[in-house]
Design a protein with these regions (language model features):
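Serine-dependent protease modules
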Residues: 20-237
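N-terminal signal peptide c-region/cleavage motif recognized by signal peptidases
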Residues: 13-16
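Positively charged n-region of N-terminal signal peptides that target proteins for export
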Residues: 1-5
Length: 237
């Protein structure tokens, strides 16, 4: 009987020691860190600076004879250059980049800056205004970091997700959250058709075209729009 008792005590101590090794022993061990993931993925997310020529908006006053003379200046009819700020994601080593159509679709000049400060000119290969997507080609690019794609069919609500982009032009930032919803319609956000993934990771102006990635660094989707009353999700300190 004593042998069985000793064996039980020894087994219990061994199990207890193993469990103690698995249980976090300090706050530092409990803390979740995305540092390795960000180091791996962030270099494939780029900042996009685009120049768009826009025509002055028509005003109903121009049809009024009294005000017509004030609008006869030919210079007022000329298109004006506007700067568009956004983000993009490198999909291949030779410089294929995906972004939003509203960032680059009507641009006359596109400049792409990588996280390591390398800079490239870019041209639009394909554009889809309905789904707000555009494919770019970086001129003379090679051996670039890029993100692998993940099929949307395997994405589940509740998964951790990171949003990487250039909000407000402050430089590349990373925010975290979860996948909050799937198969959202773009009509609610005024972006037309399409399949949209909803996340609670803070996304702000300038994040458009940036990456939403999973914990393995795979691309879940492209940050496209925000439903907000304040104009942003903030999360910028």
């Amino acid at each position: 009987m004593m042998k069985y008792f000793v064996f039980f005590v020894a087994l219990w101590c061994a199990v207890g020691a193993a469990a103690q090794q698995q249980v976090p022993q300090s706050a530092a061990q409990v803390q979740l860190s995305f540092v390795p993931l960000v180091r791996q993925s962030a270099p494939a997310v780029v900042n996009i600076y685009a120049k768009i020529m826009s025509k002055p908006q028509a005003t109903p006053l121009r049809s009024d004879p009294f005000f017509e003379r004030f609008f006869r200046n030919p210079g007022m009819e000329k298109p004006r250059a506007q700067n568009s700020l956004g983000s993009g994601v490198i999909l291949s080593a030779d410089g294929i980049v995906v972004s939003n159509f509203h960032v680059v679709g009507m641009a006359t000049d596109i400049r792409v800056v990588l996280a390591d400060r390398r800079e490239y000119s870019a041209r639009v290969l394909l554009g889809d205004a309905d789904n707000d997507l555009a494919i770019l080609q970086l001129e003379g690019a090679e051996d670039l970091p890029y993100l692998p794609l993940r099929g949307s069919d395997s994405v589940e609500v509740g998964e951790l997700a990171l949003a990487i982009g250039n909000p407000f032009g402050v430089g590349q930032t990373v925010t975290s959250g979860i996948v909050s919803g799937l198969a959202r319609s773009g009509a609610a956000a005024g972006t037309g058709r399409g399949y949209f993934i909803q996340t609670d990771a803070p996304i702000n102006p300038g994040n458009s075209g940036g990456a939403l990635i999973d914990v393995e660094g795979r691309l879940l989707g492209i940050n496209t729009s925000i439903l907000t009353r304040s104009g942003g999700s903030n999360g910028i300190g």
